Amino acid sequence: MTLSPEKQHVRPRDAADNDPVAVARGLAEKWRATAVERDRAGGSATAEREDLRASGLLSLLVPREYGGWGADWPTAIEVVREIAAADGSLGHLFGYHLTNAPMIELIGSQEQEEHLYTQIAQNNWWTGNASSENNSHVLDWKVSATPTEDGGYVLNGTKHFCSGAKGSDLLFVFGVVQDDSPQQGAIIAAAIPTSRAGVTPNDDWAAIGMRQTDSGSTDFHNVKVEPDEVLGAPNAFVLAFIQSERGSLFAPIAQLIFANVYLGIAHGALDAAREYTRTQARPWTPAGIQQATEDPYTIRSYGEFTIALQGADAAAREAAHLLQTVWDKGDALTPEDRGELMVKVSGVKALATNAALNISSGVFEVIGARGTHPRYGFDRFWRNVRTHSLHDPVSYKIADVGKHTLNGQYPIPGFTS
């Protein structure tokens, strides 16, 4: 196959013999020390992404027969959460990597699966995404894919919100066929080297949160897509949603990963606030107490935070196990299987979003005014959750659960449902 980016990153030979959750915790402990400073600086988390590359975790979901860890979905979800607890941006980036890579298996050929999974495992490839555009609505795609005589395409246009594209090795991109051929209007998906001539990830990401995710735009100028880089036939991804085929699992996978990024951030906020309350917070004089940890209202707040996380965590883990069950069905997947999973994930997304927003905001009530100083960076937790939780409206997730409970309806399969 033609997919052979120039950069080669040799994977640690014994990586798959380690506990991936323990590896993630070790990295998280290292990153936690610089998280505030890096959030303030923005830009790219280059060194931290190289840490992840060196750890071998980029092949976490790659089957062992291709040289990967062969981890299951519950384990992968735990790893995302551990990373996000230390740094929301890194949890975001790693989560998107885990969302991108399975597309090879979901809509690609057996040959593509073997080749690309092997390359990811052997060379520690980062994957990036280039799917969204900033047009009139979320599916108003204008990046053109012009067919070539050899069965490939030429891409032109600009994608936006391309999390992880910069610094990646393999880029997943969508284009719309815009010519007079029978394919006109069809959506094609492809996995191409990010180093391909004409691909330019831009340094134009600016938001209040997720500052080190490189989620800016990517330009495509006469970018050649080789025939064996095209994943599935034209409209294969769209048809997978319409027919509730295996490719439609992209949505519940992505949404469950997003939810666990939020839960990881919430855990990080709670841990940081607890340490501050124990060591630096001052008691409120009228309360008649000696230490801030004795304040009954503070105690109640920590109880409420913890209870909210207990419920959301339990639901998230249950959904991860259901995802694994559905994933293992392969092509025997039914619309009912897919629907039950999406309803479960929608509930988790709502629980995680609400818990993370409430906790990341509420911690200020238990740390006090001095805790708002920028050197502590407590604001980063809320900013990160608030920024990414706007990816798709959580109200529609709640409505999907309600429609199923009341009317027995499953969510209409789509990129976010």
From Swiss-Prot:
Gene3D superfamilies found in the cross-reference section: Acyl-CoA dehydrogenase/oxidase, N-terminal domain, Butyryl-CoA Dehydrogenase, subunit A, domain 2, Butyryl-CoA Dehydrogenase, subunit A, domain 3
UniProtKB keywords: Cytoplasm, Flavoprotein, FMN, Monooxygenase, Nucleotide-binding, Oxidoreductase
Record has Nucleotide-binding as a keyword: yes
Leading EC class: oxidoreductase
GO annotation terms (biological process): dibenzothiophene catabolic process; L-leucine catabolic process
InterPro entries: Acyl-CoA_DH_C, Acyl-CoA_Oxase/DH_mid-dom, Acyl-CoA_Oxase/DH_mid-dom_sf, AcylCo_DH-like_C, AcylCoA_DH/ox_N, AcylCoA_DH/ox_N_sf, AcylCoA_DH/oxidase_NM_dom_sf, DszC
Main location: cytoplasm
Gene Ontology MF terms in the entry: 3-methylbutanoyl-CoA dehydrogenase activity; flavin adenine dinucleotide binding; monooxygenase activity
Subcellular location: Cytoplasm
Effect of substituting residue 92 to F: No production of DBTO2 from DBT
Domain statement: The lid loop assumes one of 2 conformations allowing opening and closing of the active site; in the 3D structure one dimer is open while the other is closed. Another structure with FMN (3X0Y) proposes a different lid loop that may interact with the loop predicted here.
Function recorded in the entry: Catalyzes the first step of the '4S' desulfurization pathway that removes covalently bound sulfur from dibenzothiophene (DBT) without breaking carbon-carbon bonds. Sulfur dioxygenase which converts DBT to DBT-sulfone (DBTO2 or DBT 5,5-dioxide) in a stepwise manner.
Protein name, as recorded: Dibenzothiophene monooxygenase
